[in-house]
Amino acid sequence: MSASLDTGDFQEFLKHGLTAIASAPGSETRHSPKREEQLREKRAGLPDRHRRPIPARSRLVMLPKVETEAPGLVRSHGEQGQMPENMQVSQFKMVNYSYDEDLEELCPVCGDKVSGYHYGLLTCESCKGFFKRTVQNQKRYTCIENQNCQIDKTQRKRCPYCRFKKCIDVGMKLEAVRADRMRGGRNKFGPMYKRDRALKQQKKALIRANGLKLEAMSQVIQAMPSDLTSAIQNIHSASKGLPLSHVALPPTDYDRSPFVTSPISMTMPPHSSLHGYQPYGHFPSRAIKSEYPDPYSSSPESMMGYSYMDGYQTNSPASIPHLILELLKCEPDEPQVQAKIMAYLQQEQSNRNRQEKLSAFGLLCKMADQTLFSIVEWARSSIFFRELKVDDQMKLLQNCWSELLILDHIYRQVAHGKEGTIFLVTGEHVDYSTIISHTEVAFNNLLSLAQELVVRLRSLQFDQREFVCLKFLVLFSSDVKNLENLQLVEGVQEQVNAALLDYTVCNYPQQTEKFGQLLLRLPEIRAISKQAEDYLYYKHVNGDVPYNNLLIEMLHAKRA
């Protein structure tokens, strides 16, 4: 699709352009653009009466090219085409994301087209020359306004003081300018340039990947065990008589849970603003320009909402986006969670006689139930989530509770697991062979799928910072229907995506595909969680899992 001009812009160009040409005196002396810029800088410190008026210049602005053809699916090894072998797509829907195919970079100082890396970052030729002359000539400018002049392509020459200040603010390096006035800069910023290029390439890949949104993702190709599949099919008719809405459940287990102080009703704290953060009345749209907000923009829209770029120092030894640091603050204290769950299980076992002792599967269900309590507590106290109203909180949790459980289990194995063992939430290592010898084949197959995912994530060097990002991406799913504040959910998802991308590129530069590989694990986690839900439902209908626990309440709420 060829580039085109908006009718109003074109008419404005004709009007001002022809007027400027008609009124231009024929005897006016014209300087080269470079000379004209130098003269303007020289006059910057003079009083107003000595300044020549700057004629208004109209510029023909070409709108960015928009691709009409949606990008293809991105495979795990970076090619376009079909999904990885262990995934299949049952149905999908294209979302019309507009994006510039070439992702043309704009100068962070004035917004003009960049010409390359100059003194620390991508800038245009004009700002490059201005910065070099200012530093080499040791110029000192003054601002006749309030030192906050707007600097853009059409006004960058009006106030050199504010222009130079913005050059420094956006990251141009004084030490990169050669003092000997020779051409070329100091070649000590090569690693930073290389990392920046890699980051931009990853962003391009993300944008293309986000151009295709899967409306529904099927399960992993490996089918569920035949006995589980047939059992689920056979119980559908019998299950129609089960209550699928919220029912009055016996409060015994909930009362004893160390994570709650009252019978569980999934009640969330009232809607309140985050302390220290601006309210989320606006998030950028999903258009390409705002999907990765320019940290240097000073427009009102860009200043609203939470920006992970704040305080993000790319030159630190291990760069961590500020948003990820905030997400880490929300993480529960793991030893405390372990102690609470262990105390609960010991109390539970002591209240039973020898004949009523829990089976291996029953004990694992109790652990999962208490882990789910801790996950709900984590969500309730987390940044962004507590900004949502209770109804939206309920919908998000009911949608992803099983995925969060699976992700929690998998990360625990990646971080603490040992070869041939399963690391339980209680902090104990149990032999893998011991568990599979006391549970059914269907459960063992689910455990095997999870362990395969553990191996893949270990090979990616999956760490806690990436784990918290994936948790928030799972929790803030824009696929949930009837959300009142969908804009906030989408905005959080976009910002966490961007923070995760920056983190992986800056901290794992040797793994160029890590970001994409991590995102590809999310559909696999969802597929495993779906099978786990079906298995849990099957066991529940057979009477192996009681009603009075959070697992079953959430299971019924999701199926309602």
UniProtKB/Swiss-Prot annotation:
Sumoylated by SUMO1 at Lys-289 during the hepatic acute phase response, leading to promote interaction with GPS2 and prevent N-Cor corepressor complex dissociation. It is found in: Nucleus; Chromosome. A zinc finger (NR C4-type) spans 107-127, 143-167. InterPro entries: NHR-like_dom_sf, NR5-like, Nucl_hrmn_rcpt_lig-bd, Nuclear_hrmn_rcpt, Znf_hrmn_rcpt, Znf_NHR/GATA. Residues 28-48 have a biased composition (Basic and acidic residues). Keywords: Activator, Chromosome, Developmental protein, DNA-binding, Isopeptide bond, Lipid-binding, Metal-binding, Nucleus, Receptor, Transcription, Transcription regulation, Ubl conjugation, Zinc, Zinc-finger. Zn(2+) 2 binds at C143, C149, C159, C162. The keyword Nucleus applies. One of its GO terms (biological process) is Sertoli cell development. Residues 319-558 form the NR LBD domain. GO terms for molecular function: chromatin binding; DNA binding; DNA-binding transcription activator activity, RNA polymerase II-specific; DNA-binding transcription factor activity; nuclear receptor activity; phospholipid binding; RNA polymerase II cis-regulatory region sequence-specific DNA binding; transcription coregulator binding. Residues 104-175 bind DNA. Residues 21-55 are annotated as: Disordered. GO terms for cellular component: chromosome; cytosol; nucleus; RNA polymerase II transcription regulator complex. Zn(2+) 1 binds at C107, C110, C124, C127. A motif (FTZ-F1 box) lies at residues 189-208. Its main location: nucleus. Disruption phenotype: Embryonic lethality between 6.5-7.5 days post coitum (dpc). Embryos arrest at the early morula stage and display altered lineage specification, frequent mitotic failure and substantial chromosome segregation defects. Conditional deletion of maternal transcripts has limited effects on zygotic genome activation (ZGA). Conditional deletion in the pancreas leads to defects in all three epithelial tissues of the pancreas at birth: a partial loss of endocrine cells, a disrupted ductal tree and nearly complete absence of acinar cells. SUPFAM superfamilies: Glucocorticoid receptor-like (DNA-binding domain), Nuclear receptor ligand-binding domain. Residues 173-188 are annotated as: C-terminal extension (CTE). Belongs to the nuclear hormone receptor family. NR5 subfamily. Orphan nuclear receptor that binds DNA as a monomer to the 5'-TCAAGGCCA-3' sequence and controls expression of target genes: regulates key biological processes, such as early embryonic development, cholesterol and bile acid synthesis pathways, as well as liver and pancreas morphogenesis. Ligand-binding causes conformational change which causes recruitment of coactivators, promoting target gene activation. The C-terminal extension (CTE) loop competes with a DNA minor groove anchor of the nucleosome and releases entry-exit site DNA, thereby promoting opening of closed chromatin. Monomer; Binds DNA as a monomer. Interacts with nuclear receptor corepressors NR0B1 and NR0B2; repressing NR5A2 nuclear receptor activity. Interacts with nuclear receptor coactivators CTNNB1, PPARGC1A and NCOA2; interaction takes place following ligand-binding and promotes target gene activation. Interacts (when sumoylated) with GPS2; interaction with GPS2 onto hepatic acute phase protein promoters prevents N-Cor corepressor complex dissociation. Interacts with HNF1A. Interacts with GRIP1. This is Nuclear receptor subfamily 5 group A member 2. It comes from Mus musculus.
